Amino acid sequence: MDKFRVQGPTRLQGEVTISGAKNAALPILFSALLAEEPVEIQNVPKLKDIDTTMKLLSQLGAKVERNGSVWIDAGPVDVFCAPYDLVKTMRASIWALGPLVARFGQGQVSLPGGCAIGARPVDLHISGLEQLGAEIKLEEGYVKASVSGRLKGAHIVMDKVSVGATVTIMSAATLAEGTTIIENAAREPEIVDTANFLNALGAKITGQGSDRITIEGVQRLGGGVYRVLPDRIETGTFLVAAAISGGKILCRNAQPDTLDAVLAKLRDAGADIETGEDWISLDMHGNRPKAVNVRTAPHPGFPTDMQAQFTLLNLVAEGTGVITETIFENRFMHIPELIRMGAHAEIESNTAICHGVKQLSGAQVMATDLRASASLVLAGCIAEGTTIVDRIYHIDRGYERIEDKLQALGANIQRVKGE
């Protein structure tokens, strides 16, 4: 398995170009199954999960090509089962189910894999599709959905806010007969982006970005061209990289209005921040950040995917900061690794109390999930000495060329190829 070797400490400064959002690109790629004509999707990041999705769409019979953009022609799809060997590495595969049953009247997806953070059940996806008229069976490790004729529009009140289930219901409802209303819908920018993509193909979706989404079913979706929005979590990660090192950064191809909660906390930490239509700059003027209190919440609250990075910020900040994780259980797995590097923290159920130290020291650490591993790499950039980050396949699932981008900011980081 590959590792990163990071030599520190370094002050990170310079420019970085942000990639397209993985968490928008994935639902958009799966939603392309609804289209009877070819679609071109631009600004798709080059990541393992994206490659897996393209392979999965090909196995279903779609024509998939990548040359700059990703081109998908789902016209010839004639296989309706997403097999275990592809699904096991990526839980996003469940997003194939709604489009398959909506367009072809049948679909099966193996129960998914992915990051090891907490329980992420598929129940909400299943109950949403059932309310649209699909018959669901769980057999031999597969979720099997079928419907005779078209799905039927429904008024669906979601038990809890779920990004994944909102995508499933919204995409399936585009081809349902009648109108579907989703109450307590997720409001994330990636949901808005997926809805805008579907509308570009001829869907009739309104209210995306609010907690009430309305979908008027249409007979078919055509082709189109769409550009995926920038990755707000990658943007936030690089802003934190500059903040913890007293540095200065300009993020290009960014979308500031998707990061309000994160930018507010960075300002609280003492960062000087400016924004334009598609850029964000941060300058610490060489200062250490101040500790901040963070409580994760569904959008527009503070994103759980930025929690590990802000935990690290607090661990090297002036003062004490409290991090409360309300979205996923089991999401402080990076803290014991950071303690090996000299950090001071206590964990009490879903709360981490972080006492800032002036300097971390390099150590051998192990990545456990995607965002936790990013925080370990950033810790290595500012720690005294050498840090080895093991199991970095987690990082490759969510960050495009993170080592190249960090090197451009002055980091001393190398990928060490595994045996």
Swiss-Prot record:
Q: Which residues cross the membrane?
A: none
Query: What pathway is it annotated to?
Result: Cell wall biogenesis; peptidoglycan biosynthesis
Key words of the record: Cell cycle, Cell division, Cell shape, Cell wall biogenesis/degradation, Cytoplasm, Peptidoglycan synthesis, Pyruvate, Transferase
CDD domains in alphabetical order: UdpNAET
Q: Which InterPro entries match?
A: Enolpyruvate_Tfrase_dom (IPR001986), Enolpyruvate_Tfrase_sf (IPR036968), MurA_subfamily (IPR050068), RNA3'P_cycl/enolpyr_Trfase_a/b (IPR013792), UDP_GlcNAc_COvinyl_MurA (IPR005750)
Which protein family is it in? Belongs to the EPSP synthase family. MurA subfamily.
Q: What is the protein name stated in its UniProt record?
A: UDP-N-acetylglucosamine 1-carboxyvinyltransferase
The gene for this chain is murA
